[in-house]
């Protein structure tokens, strides 16, 4: 009879991830799933990651990609709708991470408790004719609510913020954390990796190279003219004609619009954004692990310019963005672009600050 009891207990544990009512508090009482180092079943110790907005266009693909990451031992999937379905689907993948789903505002705290990394793609997507700033009124409130949960339940977690407009939502998150007394500028990271991925891809097309061999620093922000690719600093070192510079800069800045228009109302850049978010999250996890020289571009608190936040290359480590790199030498085209970017960014950042301080 004891064997049957143990079997029933194991079955209950395996199916628990499909029940949104299953909480970390319940987990702690369980001698197997509540192990101190949070091992995945049969796996190695890893990190606890939460995705807020896991059932959305970006969130579903991102959930799949993070389930595949060997550095993740526990993956919490949260959304206000459809979280159980995404959780069940992703949980059938035979990779090491244990997956649990959380549904609705009442379970936000359970989804966040004890997390090492929180990724936030939640919010409404862009539609044809919309700019990222058009999303502000809806997404600003969503980010505020979710970051209040982070401040309460996992104040030491690294936060990867994807929700647009990133140029404003990072400032919103910072103000929420300041109010809660938990703000650590090194741990709040706006995800601009897709701008870099696009830059690498488009530049590689012009140069006839594999995109994996190309590195283009992209600085500034994450919308329109605030996205500034530094083509003078491309690796491998390359030269471009004025027309190529104009073409590449415009295409990189308008990459999101290109996808929105191509999908003709059926969505935005969800797949490439999920890829970029997973790539950046992996870099953050490698930094947390203590890997050396983990360098990515991110929109962070910065003293590189007079603005409070700015996207540049950063070195990721155990405490987040441990080093923020300077811009380096710019050519005249880039200096003009930088001034345009800063002017636009200043208003977007202030808009986020005012949303919380109003």
Swiss-Prot record:
Principal cellular location given in the protein's record: other
Catalytic activity: (S)-malate + NAD(+) = oxaloacetate + NADH + H(+)
MF terms in GO: L-malate dehydrogenase (NAD+) activity
Keywords: Glyoxylate bypass, Glyoxysome, NAD, Oxidoreductase, Peroxisome, Transit peptide, Tricarboxylic acid cycle
Residues binding substrate: 126, 132, 164, 198
Enzyme class: oxidoreductase
Record carries keyword Chloroplast: no
Single GO cellular component term: glyoxysome
Annotated catalytic residues: 222 (proton acceptor)
Binding-site residues for NAD(+), renumbered to this chain: 53-59, 79, 139, 162-164, 273
PROSITE patterns documented for this protein: MDH
Pfam families for this protein: Ldh_1_C, Ldh_1_N
Family assignment from sequence similarity: Belongs to the LDH/MDH superfamily. MDH type 1 family.
Protein name: Malate dehydrogenase 2, glyoxysomal
Originating organism: Brassica napus (Rape)
Biological classification of the source: Eukaryota, Viridiplantae, Streptophyta, Embryophyta, Tracheophyta
């Amino acid at each position: 009879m004891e064997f049957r009891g143990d079997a029933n207990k194991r079955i209950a544990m395996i199916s628990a991830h499909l029940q949104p009512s299953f909480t970390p508090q319940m987990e702690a009482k369980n001698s197997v799933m509540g192990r101190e180092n949070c091992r995945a079943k049969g796996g190695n110790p890893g990190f606890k990651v939460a995705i807020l907005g896991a059932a959305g266009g970006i969130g579903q693909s991102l959930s799949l990609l993070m389930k595949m990451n060997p550095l993740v031992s526990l993956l919490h999937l949260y959304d206000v709708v459809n979280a159980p379905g995404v959780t069940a689907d992703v949980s059938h993948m035979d990779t090491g991470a244990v997956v649990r789903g959380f549904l609705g505002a009442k379970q936000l705290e359970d989804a966040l408790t004890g997390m090492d990394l929180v990724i936030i793609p939640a919010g409404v997507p862009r539609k044809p004719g919309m700019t990222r700033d058009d999303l502000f009124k809806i997404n600003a409130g969503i980010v505020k609510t979710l970051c209040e949960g982070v401040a309460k339940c996992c104040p030491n977690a690294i936060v990867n913020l994807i929700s647009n407009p990133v140029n404003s939502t990072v400032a919103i998150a910072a103000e929420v954390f300041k109010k809660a007394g938990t703000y650590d500028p090194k741990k709040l990271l706006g995800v601009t990796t897709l701008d870099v991925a696009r830059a690498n891809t488009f530049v590689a097309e012009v140069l006839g190279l594999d995109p994996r061999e190309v590195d283009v620093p992209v600085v500034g922000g994450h919308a329109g003219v605030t996205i500034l690719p530094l083509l003078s600093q491309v690796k491998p070192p390359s030269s471009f004609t004025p027309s190529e510079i104009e073409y590449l800069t415009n295409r990189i800045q308008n990459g999101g619009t290109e996808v929105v228009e191509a999908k003709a109302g059926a969505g935005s850049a969800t797949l490439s954004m999920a890829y970029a978010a997973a790539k950046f999250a992996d870099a953050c996890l490698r930094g947390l692990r203590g890997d050396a020289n983990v360098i990515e571009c991110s929109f962070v608190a910065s003293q590189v310019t007079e603005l409070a936040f700015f996207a540049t290359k950063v070195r990721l480590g155990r405490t987040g963005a441990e080093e923020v790199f300077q811009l380096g030498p710019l050519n005249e085209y880039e200096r003009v672009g930088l001034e345009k970017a800063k002017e636009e960014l200043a208003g977007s950042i202030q808009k986020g600050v005012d949303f919380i301080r109003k």
